From Swiss-Prot:
It comes from Rhodopseudomonas palustris (strain BisB5). It is found in: Cytoplasm. PANTHER family: PROTEIN-EXPORT PROTEIN SECB, PTHR36918. GO terms for biological process: protein folding; protein tetramerization; protein transport. GO terms for molecular function: unfolded protein binding. Belongs to the SecB family. It holds the Pfam family SecB. One of the proteins required for the normal export of preproteins out of the cell cytoplasm. It is a molecular chaperone that binds to a subset of precursor proteins, maintaining them in a translocation-competent state. It also specifically binds to its receptor SecA. The gene is secB. One of its GO terms (cellular component) is cytoplasm. The keyword Transport applies. It comes from the Bacteria. Its main location: cytoplasm. This is Protein-export protein SecB.
């Protein structure tokens, strides 16, 4: 087969996403009212979770993606526990069209990091004297769309 001028078509390299490293950048767990907060609660605590994704270009085709998860459990006006986790990975991404690069970095990379961050949070909460907190799966596509809409409304580049 030729490309019309008699020369064979150039082989199109397949897109690649490689995880080069994963690590905890920052972890904080606070149990400000222990040991009183460890007593059996009359009602389920209100748990508020915030998730954000950030990325930095480290080198050609290499990106650090950070999944930030913050949470707080409250019973009435009493804080039972709070936590912050910044869990990151270094990814090598090659042969991906430029228009697909940003969504790949901001959706697929955090999706790969999430199970590890979830386990770290569950363990930290358990080690703080509470039942493990098992985070629900995250819709990273929806999170990406929300962030893009917010940036468009604010007139900021992505």
């Amino acid at each position: 087969m030729t490309n019309g001028n008699g020369a064979p078509p150039e082989a199109v390299a397949a897109p690649q996403l490689n995880v080069l490293a994963q690590y905890t950048k920052d972890l904080s767990f606070e149990n400000p009212n222990a040991p009183a907060s460890l007593a059996q609660q009359q009602q389920q605590p209100a748990i508020n979770i915030q998730i954000n994704v950030g990325a930095n270009n480290l080198a050609e085709n290499e990106y650090e993606v950070t999944l930030s998860v913050e949470g707080k459990a409250e019973s009435g006006s009493t804080v039972l526990f709070s936590f912050e986790l910044a869990y990151a990975g270094v990814f090598r991404i090659v042969n991906v069209p430029q228009e697909n690069l940003h969504p790949l970095i901001m959706i697929e990379c955090p999706r790969l990091l999430f199970p590890f961050a979830r386990e770290i949070i569950a363990s930290a909460v358990r080690d703080g004297g509470f039942p493990p907190l098992m985070l629900d799966p995250v819709d990273f596509v929806g999170l990406y769309r929300q962030n893009m809409e917010r940036q468009a409304q604010q007139g900021q580049p992505s």
